[in-house]
């Protein structure tokens, strides 16, 4: 039976749509991480990727602040990310909506730190959730065959970068 894997932080709120489209039960893997760690990670990426002339766009957070005439600083960046039009709010709200609509049995939560600390154990849990057979993975020789254009999309060059070794790189 084919397995479709897609990523979108809003899928948790759209279970009936997904099931109507794929004509089978949806199973959604929900990555979770402490909010302070997410904010620190995004701020680190912003500081590591300063806007340069010729780039398609400024990072998506500062772009919003400039557009709304809000001073650019870390506090305002975090505030925007947590506001109803920010990506953290969007993710949290979509998950809440899915739970409120009774779809929590279709969700499997994967904590970032658990994945980094015990990747094979977490993947085994994911395989069990999906009804698939688990197999051993190598976490010291990773590659990404499908690069995303994060500069154009987010103004951040390494937002979805896959390192060759699975390890925590920022708090």
Regions found by a protein language model. Name each.
Residues 1-17:
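Glycine-rich phosphate-binding loop used to anchor ATP phosphates in small-molecule kinases
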Residues 7, 18-46:
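Conserved phosphate-donor/acceptor-positioning beta-strand/loop module used by diverse small-molecule
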Residues 9-10, 35, 114-116:
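Short, flexible loop/turn elements at secondary-structure junctions
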Residues 12-16, 22, 119:
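Short, well-ordered alpha-helical microsegments
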Residues 13-16, 40, 124:
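Alpha-helical elements of the RecA-like P-loop NTPase motor core of helicases
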Residues 40, 54-55:
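Phosphate/Mg2+-binding loops and adjacent switch elements
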Residues 43, 51-52, 60-109, 117-171:
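PAPS-dependent sulfotransferases, especially Golgi type II membrane carbohydrate sulfotransferases
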